[in-house]
């Protein structure tokens, strides 16, 4: 089931905040009023996951400039996130909150739970300030994601929100032309 254009479901979870080195509660209400990226991954202390989360950290400053909050989520607890942060060179660089979802509530809400393993699939979601999913990417377990493409997707989502009636074509970049769908454009692209 696609979550595009759907409001995220309610949840309450504990997260590890590496910036403050503390645990905190996170709910769907924390997503309201700003853009958010939620990056699901299978497990702490694994192999592809730290490379993805470090790559996301490498884009963190750009995401912050765009007013985007970043959250990673796995079915591990927030305690395990803290231990991983304290022991992994890649994960020790993270500045964004790491949500623990041992109840699998959030993972189920976003429809990325692998029922057989009980782990999250590799899913990335862009959520607008109204708490509505605007973009989603889900990869097979062995395929890591590229966070640099995420920045441009967010810019496109923000542009479309600010310019109703316009759409961003493939490979759209900030400053390039958008399209205004209409009868005069049919068959001319």
Swiss-Prot record:
Q: Which organism was this protein described from?
A: Staphylococcus epidermidis (strain ATCC 12228 / FDA PCI 1200)
Q: Where in the cell is it found?
A: Cytoplasm
Enzyme class, spelled out = oxidoreductase
Task: Enumerate the InterPro entries for this protein.
Answer: AhpC, AhpC/TSA, Peroxiredoxin, Peroxiredoxin_AhpC-typ, Peroxiredoxin_C, Thioredoxin-like_sf, Thioredoxin_domain
Q: Which family does it belong to?
A: Belongs to the peroxiredoxin family. AhpC/Prx1 subfamily.
Q: Which UniProt keywords apply?
A: Antioxidant, Cytoplasm, Disulfide bond, Oxidoreductase, Peroxidase, Redox-active center
Question: What's this chain's function?
Answer: Thiol-specific peroxidase that catalyzes the reduction of hydrogen peroxide and organic hydroperoxides to water and alcohols, respectively. Plays a role in cell protection against oxidative stress by detoxifying peroxides.
The record, for Pfam families, names: 1-cysPrx_C, AhpC-TSA
Task: From the UniProt record, report the name of the gene that encodes this protein.
Answer: ahpC
Where on the tree of life does the source sit, at the highest rank?
Answer: Bacteria
User: Which protein, by its recorded name, is this?
Assistant: Alkyl hydroperoxide reductase C
Per the UniProt entry, the Enzyme Commission number(s) are 1.11.1.26
- Determine if Cytoplasm is one of this entry's keywords: yes
Q: How does it assemble?
A: Homodimer; disulfide-linked, upon oxidation. 5 homodimers assemble to form a ring-like decamer.
What catalytic activity is recorded? Answer: a hydroperoxide + NADH + H(+) = an alcohol + NAD(+) + H2O
């Amino acid at each position: 089931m696609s979550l595009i254009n759907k409001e995220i479901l309610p949840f309450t979870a504990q997260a590890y905040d590496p910036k403050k080195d503390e645990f905190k509660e996170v709910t769907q209400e924390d997503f309201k009023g700003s853009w958010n990226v939620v990056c699901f991954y299978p497990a702490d202390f694994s192999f592809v996951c730290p490379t993805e989360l470090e790559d996301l950290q490498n884009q963190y400053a750009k995401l912050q400039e765009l007013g985007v909050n970043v959250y990673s989520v796995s079915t591990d607890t927030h305690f395990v996130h803290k231990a991983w942060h304290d022991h992994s060179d890649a994960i020790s660089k993270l500045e964004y909150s790491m949500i623990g979802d041992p109840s699998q509530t959030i993972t189920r809400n976003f429809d990325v739970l692998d029922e057989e393993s009980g782990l999250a699939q590799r899913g990335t979601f862009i959520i607008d300030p109204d708490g509505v999913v605007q973009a989603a990417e889900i990869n097979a377990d062995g395929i890591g994601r590229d966070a640099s493409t995420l920045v441009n997707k967010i810019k496109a989502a923000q542009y479309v929100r600010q310019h109703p009636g316009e759409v961003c074509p493939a490979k759209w970049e900030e400053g390039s032309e958008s399209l205004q769908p209409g009868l005069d454009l049919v068959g001319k692209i």
